[in-house]
């Protein structure tokens, strides 16, 4: 048989016509105001690694192949939760090289090829790719926007295929900023308990919630196995260190769950010793760092609301560091290209996130505030002029 490529991969790996246009336009424009900034590193607010190097560097050359991850680092993650009102035993904390790897471990642990995962729409396209690479299928449930607020369409959870194994919650959601309420959580848990699903909560943006909504660590989950995913990428703005975690409540799966997760993780042992060593002192400063990031985000949210006062344009952002803007009558791909061509402003078009209607764009709340404000005023002028 002729060698070919795995059916896990898309048949067409080339860039879409839109991205070819966008790339060509970037080359022509040369410089632009970037409203797609995805990390504090690129936004000029990095974590001060020099402040923790002396505390960590002595362990850079240590090799301790624990399938759950270094105990001292798991203890640091447990303290991270405790500082925020959560309580997890270190035995139920699994360290990974990234949130993506945490997904991969869970998919291998809980699913068989052909099984299904329920994912939120609008949502981040990476989730579909991660599932496909494990021979899994994704099916949508929906967040709807009305009166300037995003809400779970709990009825859409009922349209699930029989092979569903996991309900995936992203809270705060990327890109809408929706945060699960207790009522929405209870509806999800009720469905998961009845249908024998696990719940995976991607809360990488969980440190950045602005409306006082609790994180669901202490809410009732009945007998449902629940996994909470996070990492250094967002909590201390350091994606370059490649360390994530899952903290879990085994529910009906009991003690065997830990054995199963460790079995899969032990096959990879992906996290480096420097990442383990640095995570411990970095997490001890995570609340201080959070305050720096949150100031930038809140300043930009204030600017956003002053420029676009209407909730029809900017629905409420409960958390995260992105905001979704809707311009009725616009085509989001056309608007994205027009903003770059005419004003040197780079945004993300809504179709990347499967928004249900046209006219959505997504902007980062990490961009330096004066540049952010200037760009928003140009966007407002451009969209109101049409």
Question: What is each of the regions a protein language model found here?
Answer:
Residues 276, 280, 296-305, 313-326, ...:
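Conserved glycine-rich beta-strand-loop-beta hairpin in the small C-terminal domain of fold type I
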